[in-house]
């Protein structure tokens, strides 16, 4: 009996111990095959107690999966068809595939063309000869207001421009096209352009284009494109140097009307670019908020702390509803260009029985200080707000939109600047053009102190929505036939036509789109 029992024990031990161990190993391998890597990483983090156990990791994973469900083929076709349909010179704002986009599209041929996004400082120039003779290409220019499409940045990097896409993705031309957009870096040499060679709906893969400062001027990025993709600009200061960018502080509120008991102010901390302000204006439209006064500039230091907004004065008859008179904006929210805002809510004080406060509360005056944490005594901006019930701004804004601002082609702009810059004995230089545009002697003397008076005058002409036909007429009147000839050559090369004999005649020509005037 004993020998038999001793010979039976090893096999019994294998059955009792080996089978459960093998089952556990097989189960672990199955889990490893089926469990996504992100979930496994989260499980290991929880087991290592590097994160609080209460973190709802599965819920976050489900939320992410719901937000990033792959688009169906019909959805993608409709998405790109909408973006590439000609907009007849108009700038469109649409929510497409959960992305807020601003875009314009048109067809171009061998004569080239220019696309502009209204009030954003973004343009795309397709030069003459970029498209083969006999062909037509649809092109689009897109401003991406989806913050998730921006590059993933380190604490040392700051976003200083919008994300811009040129479409269709991957399109190439016989000549380089020129993309122009604004940046807010204090030092242009620290501004580095990035490109993501992906479509709008794909995961972005951002890579630098050249060295820092290669495509940046004082406040603008200009990139010569060999093919179309996504582009942006990132602030990268050299080691040991401070990285800084310009912010614009914008104050919004709804109209103050009689009988209104509460009033809310919203203060936005935006990159100092036109498109950032347009985003805030668009964001305020559903709430009836309107911009109060001009934006104020702020020199934001990338190496400093959070931004503080401190309420210092409220006019009599009003009180602060919030518990605190000081609010903080996280440093990285501003540094990475997320367009944050903070708000204060005020209410009218109840009047005493023996005192009439109606005369005091039909107007509100507020003073706020804003500064980076720890720098209150060194650098601070003062924000003042005033509103009254009698102001005309309380009326709803008009429905009609202002006309877009035309823009001269860069190469023609530079050629005219060089021709008009030198002072002429007869006075038919940039000063004569300034007089034709309605500037008085004092303003002309002020412009003479600028770095490039001719460039300033040409920019003023752009802001007045002048066409090339009008500028040709002015040059002829000024007897500047060299400038008129340069404009004529550009028009002949791009449109095959001659400028109209009368000022404003181009606006009556229905055959020319807005972009084609330039």
Curated annotation (Swiss-Prot):
It is found in: Membrane; Cytoplasm. Residues 1-10 are extracellular. The keyword DNA damage does not apply. Keywords: Cytoplasm, Membrane, Transmembrane, Transmembrane helix. The chain crosses the membrane at residues 11-31. Residues 102-237 form the ZU5 domain. It comes from the Eukaryota. Residues 494-503 have a biased composition (Gly residues). The active site is at 227, 229. Residues 186-400 are annotated as: Interaction with RELA and NFKB1. Expressed in pancreas, liver and kidney. Inhibits NF-kappa-B-dependent transcription by impairing NF-kappa-B binding to its targets. This is UNC5C-like protein. It comes from Homo sapiens (Human). The gene is UNC5CL.
């Amino acid at each position: 009996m004993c020998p038999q029992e001793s010979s039976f024990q090893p096999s019994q031990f294998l059955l009792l111990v080996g089978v459960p161990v093998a089952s556990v190993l097989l189960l672990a391998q199955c889990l490893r095959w089926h469990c996504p890597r992100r979930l496994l990483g989260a499980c290991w983090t929880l087991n290592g107690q590097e994160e609080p156990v209460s973190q709802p990791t599965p819920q976050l994973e489900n939320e992410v999966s719901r937000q990033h469900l792959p688009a169906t083929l019909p959805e993608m076709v409709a998405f790109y068809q909408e973006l590439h349909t000609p907009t007849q010179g108009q700038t469109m704002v649409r929510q497409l595939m959960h992305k807020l986009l601003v875009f314009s599209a048109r067809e171009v041929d061998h004569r080239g063309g220019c696309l502009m996004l209204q009030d954003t400082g973004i343009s795309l120039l397709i030069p003459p000869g970029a498209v083969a003779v006999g062909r037509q290409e649809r092109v689009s220019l897109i401003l991406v207001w989806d913050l998730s499409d921006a590059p993933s940045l380190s604490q040392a990097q700051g976003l200083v421009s919008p994300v811009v896409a040129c479409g269709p993705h991957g399109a190439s031309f016989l000549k380089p096209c020129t993309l122009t957009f604004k940046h807010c870096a204090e030092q242009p040499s620290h501004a580095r352009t990035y490109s993501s060679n992906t479509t709008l709906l794909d995961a972005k893969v951002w890579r630098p284009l050249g060295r820092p400062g290669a495509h940046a001027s004082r406040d603008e990025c200009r990139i010569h494109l060999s093919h179309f993709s996504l582009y942006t600009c990132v602030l990268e200061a050299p080691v040991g140097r401070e990285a800084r960018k310009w912010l614009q502080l914008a104050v919004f509120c709804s109209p103050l009307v009689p009988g209104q008991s509460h009033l809310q102010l919203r203060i936005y901390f935006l990159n100092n670019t036109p498109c950032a302000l347009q985003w805030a204006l668009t964001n305020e439209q559903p709430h009836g908020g309107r911009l109060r006064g001009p934006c104020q500039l702020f020199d934001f230091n990338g190496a400093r702390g959070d931004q503080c907004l401190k309420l210092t004065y409220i006019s009599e008859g009003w009180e602060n509803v919030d518990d605190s008179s000081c609010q903080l904006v996280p440093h990285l929210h501003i540094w990475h260009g997320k367009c944050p805002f903070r708000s204060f809510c005020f209410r009218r004080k109840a009047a005493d029985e023996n005192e009439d406060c109606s005369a005091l509360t039909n107007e509100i005056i507020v003073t706020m200080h804003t500064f980076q944490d720890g720098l209150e005594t060194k650098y601070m901006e003062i924000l003042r707000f005033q509103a009254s019930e009698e102001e005309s701004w309380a009326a709803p804004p008009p429905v009609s939109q202002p006309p877009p601002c035309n823009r001269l082609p860069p190469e023609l702009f530079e050629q005219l600047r060089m021709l008009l810059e030198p002072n002429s004995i007869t006075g038919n230089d940039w000063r004569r053009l300034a007089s034709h545009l309605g500037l008085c002697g004092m303003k002309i003397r002020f412009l003479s102190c600028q770095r490039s008076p001719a460039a300033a005058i040409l920019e003023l002409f752009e802001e007045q929505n002048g066409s090339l036909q009008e500028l040709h007429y002015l040059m002829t009147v000024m007897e500047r036939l060299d400038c008129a000839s340069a404009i004529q050559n550009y028009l002949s090369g791009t449109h095959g036509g001659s400028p109209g004999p009368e000022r404003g005649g181009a606006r009556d020509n229905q055959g020319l789109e807005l972009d084609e005037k330039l």
